[in-house]
Amino acid sequence: MIIKHAKIYTPRHTFEEGDLFIREGRIVPFAQPEAGEEVLDAKGAYALPGLVDIHFHGAMGKDFCDGTEEAIQTLADFEASKGVLAICPATMTFSEEILNGVMDAAAAHRNGKGADLVGINMEGPFISPKKVGAQNPEYLHPADVGMFRRLQKRANGLIKLVDVAPEEPGALEFIRECCGEVRISIAHTCTSYNTACAAFDAGATHMTHLYNAMPGITHRAPGPIIAALERGAEVELITDNVHIHPAMVRFTFRTFGDDHVILIADSMMACGLPDGQYSLGGQAVTVKGPRATLTEQPGTIAGSATCLYDCMKRAVLEMGVPLESAVRAASENPARSIGIDNDYGSLSAGRYGNVILADEALNIQAVVQKGTRIV
């Protein structure tokens, strides 16, 4: 495929007018047209890399923790239709028995239709009982090296991220023991600044949905957010314009830098569906507009009802984030954070030919996956 007359998002994080060439599913620097080859005229549209979502739970009435091929394929199809072409869905806090079924289903899945399943984000159960958010406290478990390794074996190595509250018993030891096997993220935590620093020094590199389910910043108790800033951690942001005020989103890009921010959807099964009653991690959730809350605790946000592409779009159009920065945070950064950036996350030569064409208002005009138009 050749995509002509596009404003291409380059590896230098700028836009340049030009053409994209895709051969055998991957981007090449240049190629002569072949007989019968599909040529897509972008007509001046933006050409963005296919997005990479490393933290979402569900969409279209399905949840990754359903533990079925039907659920995984539904998520893969929906995400691809929204320009998200690599997915690393997140588990919820469940028992090892339930998580076994999730890992088995993921290991059995074969890519080829819809977004590629490139990993698993193990958000629970190694989190704080005081910051469970919408996680089910019944299934909380101390950080357990053996449990992680058993699940990783069942997942055939697909677990890319494990979330840990570092102040909990055994957590720092877990980080030291496992940081060479999987990326460790600080999450759902009451940790102090000092303990967070110790966690990063032990091998953690990542912060799950920054600002949410963690202590804030004060001048005498800087907390985990300042620890993450000082240690150069990668930080996730949910930019659905519900979880975080736009000023805090801009603040994060300016302080951490757009090379350290990762946009995530953190979406639950209602994403793509009308308002109504749904569930997340076995708990009832009420969805109205972009807001999802626990039905029995209306003040507790229960994930989002917004896909990653729309989160990126809102970051630009509603929150004042430069387009170049938002695209980087939704494609290259998440790909790098889980080690798949040789294949996904940019329009560099050698990467998969995953391309979104979008107009000036960031409405999707086309989605190309590995050189084949799917939208």
Regions found by a protein language model. Name each.
Residues 1-48:
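Histidine-rich, glycine-flanked metal-binding segment
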Residues 224-235, 253-265, 271-351, 355-357:
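His/Asp/Glu-enriched, well-ordered alpha-helical/loop segment
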